[in-house]
């Protein structure tokens, strides 16, 4: 039992020392997923003047009082 646990630990730790398991590749995969999500969101976003629940739903920058608004209106709204 101890041998199998030790063997599994070695298999998990060994790539860290050999450089096969690089955090950079994991980060680039995460960035790629976030970019795909952002592009998908832009493709299926809510137009200006339509109802919205959050700013993520809007094609532009923000959702003010349940309506998608243009970026310039968002800046004015945030200043108030």
Swiss-Prot record:
<dbReference type="GO" id="GO:0005576">
    <property type="term" value="C:extracellular region"/>
</dbReference>
<dbReference type="GO" id="GO:0090729">
    <property type="term" value="F:toxin activity"/>
</dbReference>
<feature type="propeptide">
    <location>
        <begin position="20"/>
        <end position="41"/>
    </location>
</feature>
<feature type="disulfide bond">
    <location>
        <begin position="62"/>
        <end position="74"/>
    </location>
</feature>
<keyword id="KW-0964">Secreted</keyword>
<feature type="disulfide bond">
    <location>
        <begin position="45"/>
        <end position="59"/>
    </location>
</feature>
<feature type="disulfide bond">
    <location>
        <begin position="58"/>
        <end position="68"/>
    </location>
</feature>
<protein>
    <recommendedName>
        <fullName>Conotoxin Cl11.2</fullName>
    </recommendedName>
</protein>
<comment type="similarity">
    <text>Belongs to the conotoxin I1 superfamily.</text>
</comment>
<keyword id="KW-0165">Cleavage on pair of basic residues</keyword>
<feature type="disulfide bond">
    <location>
        <begin position="52"/>
        <end position="63"/>
    </location>
</feature>
<feature type="signal peptide">
    <location>
        <begin position="1"/>
        <end position="19"/>
    </location>
</feature>
<keyword id="KW-0800">Toxin</keyword>
<keyword id="KW-1015">Disulfide bond</keyword>
<keyword id="KW-0528">Neurotoxin</keyword>
<keyword id="KW-0732">Signal</keyword>
<dbReference type="InterPro" id="IPR013141">
    <property type="entry name" value="Conotoxin-I_CS"/>
</dbReference>
